[in-house]
Amino acid sequence: ILPAFAGPDIAQDEFFIFIHAGGAWDVTVGLDPRNEKVGIIDPATSGARGTIDPAPIRRWVDSSAAAIDGGLVYAGPSFEFVRPEGNSPLVFGPAIGDLLRHSARLTVVNGIAMNTVSHQDGTAFSSTGRHLAGTKAAASSIDTMMADATGLNQLLPALSVNFPSFYVPGPDRRAVPLTVSSIGAVGSSLIRSPLYETAAQRDAVNIVLSQEARALGKMSAEADILNGFALQLDGLRRMNQQSLLDAFTTSKLQAAYNTFRFSDNAAVINAAFAVEALTRNIVRCVSFAFSSFDTHFTNYRQQPLQQQRLFDMIATLLDYLDAKPHPTKPGDKLSDHTHIMVFSDFCRTPQINLNQGRDHYPNNSSLIISPRFKGNFVIGQSDPEQLLPLPRAFSDGMRAITPPDVLSTFVSAFGADPRKYLRDGEVIRDMLKG
């Protein structure tokens, strides 16, 4: 156990939710839309020979322009852009779904240069800011970074459900995310049999052990180690006293947060857990994956629907965060202190392939929803003919935005030094409030 109070006392009342859109999303129907056949770009189309199924896409409206002829591969009308009301710089594809009503909070980053089309490498690059070293992560992931910077005294600094979480030595080891395949797996580990002792007896044992650890700490030359034991035992007491099993039980979460559409994707339950865990103040960072975006074939017809389900989930998540009081800041809501980042491996090709799907492409977009970032804001661009990232001004010259830039900006927003965690990347201050 490392020193119990290591690191600066920063952002101790903030919470973080990280979502990986697994498989590589098609930004041309979502965050960086295209509805014209220009250059090598084949926009999504509806109709009998179209590339997608528009029926379940609530914001799909056939374009008033002439139908697009994709030769033997596809043909049909594309879509009308989706814009927020008022004079907004944001433009979306029809997959944005219910999240459109929260557009005033959204920070969209387009034209992110990935320099890879490998799922594993792109995922690691997006979450750590470093490409893989062979098959191994070269840096810790963003949930580990924020757990180290803000959550070491939390009961669970970081909990990761199928998220690309990595730990590389440097941050405090208490920041290592608890990685599980499902929320229910954590619930199973919390079940205690009453056959041998009662909850009160277990609590009494924890009290004695905590007192003993502190007493030994007063006599030890390495008091921090024993104080760390005491903190862990205190955390175990809080966990037992809160009946945390309910927070990790799927049926309980579904009943408590019944406006989520749990049938949309197995990952939706993780969003409900995030609200419950933050409300109880037991987790600093919740990270999870929302999958099924790898659409190389005719399964591309469902790509906009999968994105709509993702964005609908985030919209409902924000609704709950708006309604829930912050556990330690009276008068504030969870949404005042919860920060969300969404990213994918990379994006999909602007061309439709012969299988009526899209392949891998070294461009990307990211979405941030945070009170510390400018809302109703977009930064970065991809070119209109090839969907490749366009350069912008940085201190080292003109270049495209990269994942390390996005991660550095996010880390810096909470008073932490990006250089503690990231080798590369420049803080993009234009994205931050103030």
Which residues does each predicted region cover?
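Ligand-binding pockets and gating/stacking loops
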Residues: 1-434
